[in-house]
Amino acid sequence: MNGQTLSLRRRVYNRGMRALVWLCAGLTCALLVFLIGYIFCRGIPGLTWELLSGQTSYIKNTIGILPNILNTLYIILVAMVIVLPLGVGAAIYLTEYAENKKLVSLIEFAAETLTGIPSIIFGLVGMLFFVQKMNLQAGVLAGGLTLVVMILPTILRTTQESLKTVPQSYREGALGLGAGKWRMVRTVVLSNAIDGIVTGCILAVGRIVGESAALLYTAGFGLVLNDFFTALHSSSATLTVALYVYANERGETAVAFSIATILMLLTLLINLSAVFLGRKLKKN
């Protein structure tokens, strides 16, 4: 077999592999476009002001998702207020202060393991502990605490990876200039890793918005409009839980597709915000 034959076979092989890669990419994009287009075509016609600003009433025979939108915002607020200090603080300690490397490796392994656990298991544990053991009742508080446990490993690991991208020379330079340990972490490390930290937090919000399995057990199915403090201990369905209720229990597929459209738009907005803020903070 001469060199010319080998060269021809390589060209044929490369072209074949390139065509296969393009085919896989095209099928993936086509499937994504079809899925988004189908949901939008079924859901956008049902997005009326009455649906967005009203609430469901069996007596008046009306359907509205305003309580579910507010419950989703309540859940995000409760979860992020608790998980941000815990996750970012733990990541700073493990990366900058912890001296026992075996313990750090063990915690990192545990965090990575927890990220792979199905969310419905977190929901079951949250129901047994927060709802029944602590007697918090199904509501925003129990659901938010369950989500804290679920997304804490994600916040921890993404923050850790962002902190590790800061060159060691930056730390040594700050310490060499007389800065204390905490001042060095606050002014040098965090300022250079803020883009990755913010991006990870925004993506965590996206996971909260799309979560349903854990909240089925802990937040409840309530479709009643409540203020924040009442919703903390009252059954409060988020958008994803409401989608399940309307699609499976009430047979309101049009409303379910409208909720799915809102969730798709929220997910797109969150992802675009993560990319935009990440790039903007990185430039600054």
Q: Residues of each region from the PLM?
A:
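Hydrophobic positions within alpha-helical transmembrane segments of bacterial inner-membrane proteins
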Residues: 30, 72, 76, 80-92, ...
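Periplasmic/extracellular loop-to-transmembrane helix junction in inner-membrane transport proteins
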Residues: 3-23, 37-79, 100, 245-254
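Transmembrane alpha-helices
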Residues: 80, 158-159, 181-219
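Glycine/proline-centered hinge or cleavage motifs at structural transition points of membrane proteins
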Residues: 118, 177-178, 191
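Generic hydrophobic transmembrane alpha-helix motif, especially the helices
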Residues: 112-148
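Cytoplasmic-entry segments and transmembrane alpha-helices of multi-pass inner-membrane transporters
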Residues: 86-126, 154-161, 284
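C-terminal transmembrane helix and the adjacent membrane-cytosol boundary/short C-terminal tail
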Residues: 16, 160, 164, 202, ...
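Interhelical loop and adjacent transmembrane-helix boundary motif
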Residues: 56-63, 215-264
